[in-house]
Each structure stands twice: as C-alpha cells, then as structure tokens.
C-alpha cells in the first residue's frame, strides 16, 4: 500500500560504505513553500469530516458478539448462506478500498486531505477486523470452514461482476475526477444493498451486535463517500470533469450491478428478507445513487422516493441512548446524513 505523501517529501540518498544513519540525506528545495512545513487549514469541509471521524473512532475490541452465535442457529439454511456470502464480499471489498486509499492521498498536497485519509485508513482497518469476527461467528468459529468457503466464493459470478466492471472502468479511466466517481460508486453503491440486507436482521431481533457493527460501518462509509464528493467538487480544479453522460452512465451501470447482486443471492425461504423487503432494498440503492448525484451537483437519475420510516437503515438516523446492556453505543456525533 502506498503511504500518504509526507509534507516534507524528502529525497533520501544512499551512500555506499556508511552506516544506515549516515546514508539518509534530506534535501530541502532552495526556494521552499513555507506552508509545506506547518499546518494550514485549506479544506474546511474535509477538515470537518476528519474531526467527525476522530470524534467517532471505534475499535473492534469494543464490540462483544455475545448472543450472535446463538442467533446463527435461528437462520434458515438459505439465510445463513446469504449472509455468509455478503460478509465474504464485504470483507474482500473493504480490503480493496484500503489498498487504494494510499494512491488517492498521493495526489494531493493539502494537509487537510492527507490527514483525513489517515483517519479513513485507520477506520477501514477496524472494518476489516470486525468482518473477520463476524465471518467466524457465521461459521460457528470454524476457521477452516470459513477459509474453504471464502476460497470457493470469492470468484462467484455475482462478485466477479462487480470486480470485472470496476477493473474495466479503471483501465479506461481518462482522468483523476473519474477515479473519484469510481470511489463514490464503490463505497456509496456497491455496499448499499449489503448494508440494508444486514439491517433487516434488526427487525427480527437477530445478531444484535452484528447489527451494531453494521450501523457503525455504514455510517463511516457515509462519511467516506461524502469526502470523495467534496474532493470531486472542490479540489480537482486542474482536471477536467467527465461529461454528464459519462457520469450518468457509470451510475446507471453500478446500480444495475448492485441490484443484480442482491437479487442473485437473496434467499427464497426467508422470513427476514421478504419480496417487499427486497423491493425496498432495490429502491434504496436507486435512492442512494440519486442522493450521491445531488452531492456532486447533478440531477437525479432515477427519481427514487426516500425509504419509508420502517426501512431498517432509517433507524440509524434517530438519536440513540446507550443503556446498561449495550455493548457499544452506536450514536454518531455530528450531522452527517447517512445514505447507506
């Protein structure tokens, strides 16, 4: 993984025959920009998101998955297969996002953006570790069974459709702004249906701590997509934006793939994910696309209505109060609207 570009960007020169300490020489430009050597706020919107991320930091060790293992036995065979599949995808996709963050941060010199990406990388690590725990819960702590399942699932056509589409779009990507459109689609669309399907466990009082972690992770991703939208809008001035038809085409394709993903894997024997619930999830994916288009100052593509009050992810927007029996408060400080 590429690391975030340091403010100093020193050139390190090796000299044969000297100690390791003596081999490092820092070269400072003859006419340096003084702002490279101290912090100056240049991106107030991104700085706000960094502060929000710090305020809402959490660790996988704060979540105790007591009771979730017992709930696994309450899932039907189709439901268990479905949720194992979702978490195999989310775990793999989350690691891919982490690997790409260093490359994005290296495009900028503004410290607010660099500092923000440090925070995002840190929380993505927590996501990855939580997904590991949840996968083990779904496999009754049988690590070998989990490994064999992931090895046989990671190239499933529904997952490959997302990966192949993304790889093709990256290869043909003509500009830096288009790369940010792809990041918005990865975190804002390609996770949306999975987050919603997991949230439906809450309505059946199942896997309570898994649902708490889903609250936290989906809210984090809302911050991340907002940051990508802000950067796309405000900090890519030297790069031409892709034409509207191109952006709309990418959004339309991503939504079609995401809806196909959830349809192809939805269990047929489920009391958790009814046909009405699946229709609500599909509408939510379209609504999320329209909202993200609005964040980058474009008109909606689908004109999808917002989810109604019974949609489980909407419960995350209400104020929550920690009680004695909660393992971790999922209240989120700050006023970032969650669309995931």
UniProtKB/Swiss-Prot annotation:
Gene3D superfamilies: Ribonucleotide Reductase, subunit A. It comes from Human herpesvirus 1 (strain KOS) (HHV-1). GO terms for cellular component: host cell membrane; membrane. The active site is at residue 131. Keywords: DNA replication, Host membrane, Iron, Membrane, Metal-binding, Oxidoreductase, Transmembrane, Transmembrane helix, Viral latency, Viral reactivation from latency. The chain crosses the membrane at residues 180-200. CDD domains: RNRR2. It holds the Pfam family Ribonuc_red_sm. It comes from the Viruses. GO terms for biological process: deoxyribonucleotide biosynthetic process; DNA replication; release from viral latency. It catalyses: a 2'-deoxyribonucleoside 5'-diphosphate + [thioredoxin]-disulfide + H2O = a ribonucleoside 5'-diphosphate + [thioredoxin]-dithiol. It is a single-pass membrane protein. It is found in: Host membrane. Belongs to the ribonucleoside diphosphate reductase small chain family. Its main location: host cell. Its EC number is 1.17.4.1. Its cofactor is Fe cation. Ribonucleoside-diphosphate reductase holoenzyme provides the precursors necessary for viral DNA synthesis. Allows virus growth in non-dividing cells, as well as reactivation from latency in infected hosts. Catalyzes the biosynthesis of deoxyribonucleotides from the corresponding ribonucleotides. GO terms for molecular function: metal ion binding; ribonucleoside-diphosphate reductase activity, thioredoxin disulfide as acceptor. This is Ribonucleoside-diphosphate reductase small subunit. Fe cation 1 binds at residues 94, 124, 127. The keyword S-adenosyl-L-methionine does not apply.
């Amino acid at each position: 993984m590429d690391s975030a570009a340091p403010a100093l960007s020193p050139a390190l020169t090796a000299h044969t025959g000297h100690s390791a300490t003596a081999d490092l020489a820092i070269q400072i430009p003859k006419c340096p920009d003084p702002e490279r050597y101290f912090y100056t706020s240049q991106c107030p919107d991104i700085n706000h998101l960094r502060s929000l991320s710090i305020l809402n930091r959490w660790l996988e060790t704060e979540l105790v998955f007591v009771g979730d293992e017992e709930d696994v036995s309450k899932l039907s065979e189709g439901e268990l297969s479905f949720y194992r599949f979702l978490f195999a995808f989310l775990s793999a996709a989350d690691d891919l996002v982490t690997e790409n963050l260093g490359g994005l941060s290296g495009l900028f010199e503004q410290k607010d953006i660099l500092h923000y990406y440090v925070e995002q990388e840190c929380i993505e690590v927590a996501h990855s570790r939580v997904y590991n725990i949840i996968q083990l819960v779904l496999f009754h702590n049988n690590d070998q069974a989990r490994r064999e399942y992931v090895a046989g699932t990671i190239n499933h056509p529904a997952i490959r459709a997302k990966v192949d589409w993304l790889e093709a779009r990256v290869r043909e990507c003509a500009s830096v702004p288009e790369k940010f459109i792809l990041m918005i689609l990865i975190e804002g669309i390609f996770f949306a249906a999975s987050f919603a399907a997991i949230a439906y466990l809450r309505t059946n009082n199942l896997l309570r701590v898994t649902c708490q972690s889903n609250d936290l992770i989906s809210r984090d991703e809302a911050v991340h997509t907002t940051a990508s939208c802000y950067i796309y809008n405000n900090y890519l001035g030297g790069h031409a934006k892709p034409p509207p038809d191109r952006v709309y085409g990418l959004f339309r394709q991503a939504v079609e793939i995401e809806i196909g993903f959830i349809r192809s894997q939805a269990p047929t024997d489920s009391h958790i994910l009814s046909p009405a619930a699946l229709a609500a999830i599909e509408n939510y994916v379209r609504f999320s696309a329209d909202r993200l288009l609005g964040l980058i100052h474009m008109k909606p593509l689908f004109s999808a209505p917002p989810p109604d009050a019974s949609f489980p992810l909407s419960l995350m927007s209400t104020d929550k109060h920690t009680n004695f029996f909660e393992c971790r408060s999922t209240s989120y400080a700050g006023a970032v609207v969650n669309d995931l």
